[in-house]
Amino acid sequence: MNIMIPAWVDGTLQPVEKLEAHKLGLKHKAISVFVFHENKILLQRRALSKYHTPGLWANTCCTHPYWNETDADCASRRLFEELHLTDLPLKNRGKIEYRADVGQGLIEHELVEIFTSNCSNLPKVTPNPEEVMEVTWLDQIELANKVKTNPDEFTPWLRIYMLKHFEQISGTVTA
């Protein structure tokens, strides 16, 4: 199945096949979600079957909206598809744009809508093994330190988020 995502072609937002957008390095829309419980962040380790960055640690979930899908609907859909999380209140933290080489000749050039959820109770997480091989809750400071000392264990986008945008994501400053 060809998944069509919103990407900019010659300055116009158009439906583009997802893999083609990555091969061409086209700027495209994406979402990233960070679920917090107290001072910890829910992280996922990407399944080994993923077509890029397999086995690396990433934020709670991230994906591309389908053409004509809202960012908020996309975030909720992907939380369920990857981790079977439902009914989490999501707060929009604004947009972040980045460009990163993710290997195999693929480029992520994303305009990402960031969402967060702060859970007072620890949610039940059931990873979809086709998407996620492992999850963990990691203290924010410990995560920042690990990203600096062992960057190759983390996806390029999580490294960018933690090193350049974490105040925006965590809500300690406005977007």
Language-model regions: role of each:
Residues 82:
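Short alpha-helical functional segments enriched in proximate histidine and acidic residues
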Residues 22-31, 36-77:
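Conserved Nudix-box catalytic region and its N-terminal flanking loop in Nudix hydrolases
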Residues 33, 61, 92, 113-115:
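A structural signal for short, well-ordered beta-strand segments
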Residues 17, 55, 97, 106-114, ...:
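Nudix hydrolase/Nudix homology domain
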Residues 1-32:
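Acidic, metal-coordinating catalytic segment for phosphate/diphosphate chemistry
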Residues 86-95:
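A short coil-to-beta-strand element that immediately follows conserved catalytic motifs
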